[in-house]
Amino acid sequence: MNVDDVEDRDGVRLSWNVWPSSKIEATRTVVPISALYTPLKEREDLPPVLYEPVTCKPPCRAVLNPYCQIDVRGKLWICPFCLSRNAFPPHYKDISSTNLPAELLPKYTTIEYTLSRPAQIPPIFLYVVDTCMDDDDLKALREALVVSLSLLPPNALVGLITYGTMAQVHELGYDACPKSYVFRGTKEYAPKAIQDMLGLNPGARPMGAGAPGAPGGPSQAPRPPNATAQMGASRFLLPVSQCEFQLTQILEQLQKDPWPVANDKRSQRCTGVALSVAVGMLETTFPNTGARVMLFCGGPATEGPGMVVSTELRERIRSHHDIDKDNAKYYKRAIKFYEAMAKRAAGNGHTIDVFAGCLDQVGLLEMKGLANLTNGHMILADSFQMGIFKQSFHRLFQKDDQGHLQMGFNATLDVQCTKELKVSGLIGHAVSANKKSGCVGETEIGIGQTSAWKLCSLTPRTSAGIYFEVVTPAGQPMQPGSRGLIQFVTHYQHASGQYRLRVTTIARNFAEGGSGQIAASFDQEAAAVLMARIAVFKAEIDDSPDVLRWLDRMLIRLCQKFADYRKDDPTSFRLGENFSIYPQFMFHLRRSQFLQVFNNSPDETAFYRHVLNTEDVNNSLIMIQPTLMSYGFEGPPQPVLLDSVSIRPDVVLLLDTFFHILIFHGETVAQWRKAGYQDQEGYENFKEVLENPRADAQDLLADRFPIPRYIVCDQNGSQARFLLSKLNPSTTHMSGGMYGSSGNSGAAIFTDDVSLQVFMEHLKRLAVGASSN
């Protein structure tokens, strides 16, 4: 089985592709049976299926798939999950062994149904914009927002809230002059108060009554509460085609917050109130409808609910050290506030994106729940003028071949499995849908105690880690060739306005515990990423040393189980081909910014962890173990070891860490470049060595999201630290005698970190020695 082909077809990578037949054997394999699933994985050969799916009777409700046994004469099918017999619906009457519908063909283990019920409401985009920033930043942000209006579907509903010292909800339906409803930035508003002030409740009049379209007068006939709320909301949320001119005018005239700021103070910024108003407005008017709240913040919240630092500049925003020492004054209260906000949004299928444009921290750590629980985007840039923000923001609105946005809204993911397996949980950007089906296991990994989750929004990149446990007791006889099945069912609102159901069904064989088939089926790349997600999930709760010890313990146990060795003889230690680079992944994961917070701000740590929990196997591996290409005069570009020995004066290196793309010129290359040899005749070869990495870097930048930081640096330059921090320090200031290493063995790295070689020696010694618990 080629795991890449399976991923292309079904969007699934499994840690094990043959499963242990009993619970005890499954625990001995150390790495749990788990899947990294990309629900909207792009697949061009999927047929359009314009009818409703056939499902098993309740409570099973599994969807018809190629693994079902069918009786074409009796027009029956047997569900492989609950073994119930079901009759085909009347429109399947012409079914025969040579005339099968697409969902029963073996090549369509993944299929997407376009459901007959269209969405009642088009997608909603509510911009929440910070105005406490300098004029250049605000101008760049205004321009980006105006451009984004042209990228939205014409029928999409759009709204605008701006905030600084106060939060203002702009009434787009009033075109006589700019009009907005103002909320005080220091006050915490209950959802009902927000709805009353905006006139969204039946019988309520907005503050400043008499506004056009205000609902609820004594003479009006009663309406359903939601219809009334939507009428009230139509003053604030209008189709783009209807309000583009008005909204563009408001954006172009947007000024910096007028409240005076003393030299020793920060701006008064009420981020929490602005978000409360946005979430309160949407949950009343459009519950369980596809919507995105897009928050653009140019600095930290300094007043009202959700504040992360005071307005006094002499008070620094919290660091990792402050949080560890419980010395972060506003931290716990802010986390609690934003998480409660995120849960309210997620419960209604609404997504919150956070775009930060500031050199200092903006409180992304406290706000991480907004994006993590609603599967929103998180973008971190030094300013809104930077290409990282502008290109990432506009790339969000990419369209498919039919001209629809490549995003799904208000999504749920449901997982079904055969009786031998139970679902332990999901690690990714979701909240539990609290579905207590028979598939729910006792062991909890990530978001557990459910077999369904709300994802709120989806893109073709969204990947979720789902973890399982084997529950078959030991000693129970197993039928030869028996297999287990897992079905992933994703229901979402497509950008075209239709509801769609993507169904992926996979089957894998069971094998006895001692069988070599289990070891041979190990996918070390998928396993590394799925274990990295568990480690990061633990790191959010525990402190890092405990997580590192857990990772080391798991690695030692895996090697003890699957390596070949003679007891107490480290030189005899051998790992099979499909386990050989797993320890290397763990070495780089231990040193990565996901688990080592030194040199990163809390906001950066929150951002890096957010992105890791979004991406598929290949992109996640680049984050864990970056790729390094070498360009020299001796031959074509080639991948080289992520090691200090790869630094040579006569080569150019291209490092891809996913978050950074860095071109590094060796010492000699840098001197020649500065001397301008590349522009002289006869040095075309040198010019090519300089240009090739640039061209390859542009290819990497072309489809990456978020846009990585692009760095060009020279050996011994200050920016070279980005490369040196990622390399295995096989040559350090302590190698090769007292005064550093000799010239040809790579650059010396000044570090006390152990090298991969030392790490592997320790691993071998521990694996072949006494067993580790």
UniProtKB/Swiss-Prot annotation:
UniProt keyword terms in alphabetical order: Cytoplasm, Cytoplasmic vesicle, Endoplasmic reticulum, ER-Golgi transport, Golgi apparatus, Membrane, Metal-binding, Protein transport, Transport, Zinc
A Pfam short name: Gelsolin
Record field: transmembrane: none
Ligand binding (Zn(2+)): C56, C60, C79, C82
Superkingdom, natural source: Eukaryota
InterPro entries according to UniProt: ADF-H/Gelsolin-like_dom_sf, Gelsolin-like_dom, Gelsolin-like_dom_sf, Sec23, Sec23/24_helical_dom, Sec23/24_helical_dom_sf, Sec23/24_trunk_dom, Sec23_24_beta_S
GO MF entry, a single one: GTPase activator activity
Region (Disordered): 204-229
Location of this chain's protein in the cell: Cytoplasm; Cytoplasmic vesicle, COPII-coated vesicle membrane; Endoplasmic reticulum membrane; Golgi apparatus membrane
Gene Ontology annotations of biological process type: COPII-coated vesicle cargo loading; intracellular protein transport
PANTHER family linked to this entry: PROTEIN TRANSPORT PROTEIN SEC23 (PTHR11141:SF0)
Family of the protein in this entry: Belongs to the SEC23/SEC24 family. SEC23 subfamily.
Annotated function: Component of the coat protein complex II (COPII) which promotes the formation of transport vesicles from the endoplasmic reticulum (ER). The coat has two main functions, the physical deformation of the endoplasmic reticulum membrane into vesicles and the selection of cargo molecules.
Subunit-level organization: The COPII coat is composed of at least 5 proteins: the SEC23/24 complex, the SEC13/31 complex, and the protein SAR1.
Annotated protein name in UniProt: Protein transport protein SEC23
Species for this entry: Mycosarcoma maydis
Gene behind this protein: SEC23
